[in-house]
Amino acid sequence: MPAPVNIPSMFDTILVLDFGSQYSHLITRRLREFNVYAEMLPCTQKIAELPWKPKGVILSGGPYSVYAEGSPHVDHAVFDLGVPILGICYGMQELAWINGKGVHAGEKKEFGHATIHVEKPSDPLFHGIDNFQVWMSHGDKLNALPTGYEVVATSDNSPYAGIAHTSEKIWGIQFHPEVTHTTKGKQLLQNFAVDICGAAQKWSMENFVDTEIQRIRDLVGPHAEVIGAVSGGVDSTVGAKLMKEAIGDRFHAILVDNGVMRLNECENVKKTLGEGLGINLNVVDAADLFLGKLKGVTDPEKKRKIIGNTFIEVFEEEAAKIQPTHPEAGEIEFLLQGTLYPDVIESISFKGPSQTIKTHHNVGGLLDNMKLKLIEPLRELFKDEVRKLGEIMGIPHDLVWRHPFPGPGIAIRVLGEVTPSQVEIARKADFIYIEEIKKAGIYEEISQAFACLLPVKSVGVMGDQRTYEQVIALRAIETVDFMTADWYIFDANFLKTVARRIVNEVPGVARVVYDITSKPPATVEWE
């Protein structure tokens, strides 16, 4: 069986070396937006251990001072690769530091907008770019031009806002082209990746899908079987569809009904995945088991642990019942996991590896318990790329663009004890809310929206009768990366319609409120 080929060996790749900047992942995203594949690794990466050669290297920004003890520094072997290099902010200061030139704390720090003056329009990095607005975020600055470099751009506070060593094809810039505040940053990155590095613009989901299907076949082989949990969300659905295309019915999808899913979710998943996409689907009704274990529990972290641990128990039990799909089929050897590239970035960032990569529904324990190997067909992709891939593979548009739904489900949208009656109130209110959002044609403008049931009661009036019933809180946010988020501004008449429907159609609700808290200080979910 041939060894699976990694993606950077199949596409021209720009290597982004991360020095811990909060913007590092955006460099990778921007490059992919113009169809150049980019991969991020920590700045401590040993170049000799890299199994592929990049077309170019970008040194990211970072929160450190290059001259301070313990600050990170790049492997000098990167300069022996013979490929173009671009240093951004800290990355530029690293270039100067290695060159032996001074970097010092600036008398005036630059944070926010600044104007860049292009001093050498003929420089290939600034080709087609006039003076433009950029985003600065640095306290240190160069106090001398490194040997062999020339100034190609300045700002009012920095005589070395852009420097170039033309013969070595090395550039440094003191601003962040990857953020949207930099008006021509994407063009600058494209100048570097495409024009200077010569990277072919072939990265697309159309090209990825066949490549990934073949990679799955090479990894799994002709006989092994694969299991994976599905939830009705876009990540697990796209992953399951890829497995179906690659190995057919040797992939077994398991849907565990934990009693805290959205209204009619199980039926919808069976119809979409099983009937519509032809995926080999096993459905387990474990609602009573989950709700029984949640009885009396109010702490949100305990809810999460109970749901996660119970899921593992149910999944293992169901997996043991799965029979081979044909006489030549082998053992179940692999577990599908919906890891995305942001999860990978979180685990390798120079800020320090996270304790665990986030796992779908807390299935990480299954690997040890069941002696399974992991298969992660989406681990190179950002969320927008997963959605695009889903559409290419014929997954219904409404499913591809579905809002995220937490693994613990409605259990963390019922604040307080989770009971069948409380779940029913929360899911009915949520259904009405989402239905009205879709009717208004604004569903895809909103990153995430949901209703949650608060553990308080409120006085109301229905007809001539006084009521004393529960409160529903509505939440809707807009975000790019879910690290920060703003609350969505609805039309007042829309909120009036939703509130009226929920109070009239959901027994037990007397009041509806709308959450107008941004993230931070609040999180997206209430629990």
Swiss-Prot record:
Residue span(s) of domain Glutamine amidotransferase type-1: 13-202
Active site positions, chain numbering: C89 (nucleophile), H176, E178
- Per the record, the domain of life is Eukaryota
Cell location: Cytoplasm, Cytosol
Q: Where is the GMPS ATP-PPase domain?
A: 203-402
Q: Name the job this protein performs.
A: Catalyzes the conversion of xanthine monophosphate (XMP) to GMP in the presence of glutamine and ATP through an adenyl-XMP intermediate.
EC assignment: the record states 6.3.5.2
PANTHER family (alphabetical): GMP SYNTHASE [GLUTAMINE-HYDROLYZING], GMP SYNTHASE-RELATED
CDD domains annotated for this entry?
GATase1_GMP_Synthase (cd01742), GMP_synthase_C (cd01997)
Q: Which GO terms describe its molecular function?
A: ATP binding; GMP synthase (glutamine-hydrolyzing) activity; GMP synthase activity
Reaction equations catalysed: XMP + L-glutamine + ATP + H2O = GMP + L-glutamate + AMP + diphosphate + 2 H(+)
Q: What is its main location?
A: cytoplasm
Protein name per UniProt: GMP synthase [glutamine-hydrolyzing]
> Which PROSITE patterns does the UniProt record give?
GATASE_TYPE_1, GMPS_ATP_PPASE
Q: Which cofactor does it need?
A: Mg(2+)
Q: In which pathway does it act?
A: Purine metabolism; GMP biosynthesis; GMP from XMP (L-Gln route): step 1/1
Q: Which UniProt keyword terms apply here? A: ATP-binding, Cytoplasm, Glutamine amidotransferase, GMP biosynthesis, Ligase, Magnesium, Nucleotide-binding, Purine biosynthesis
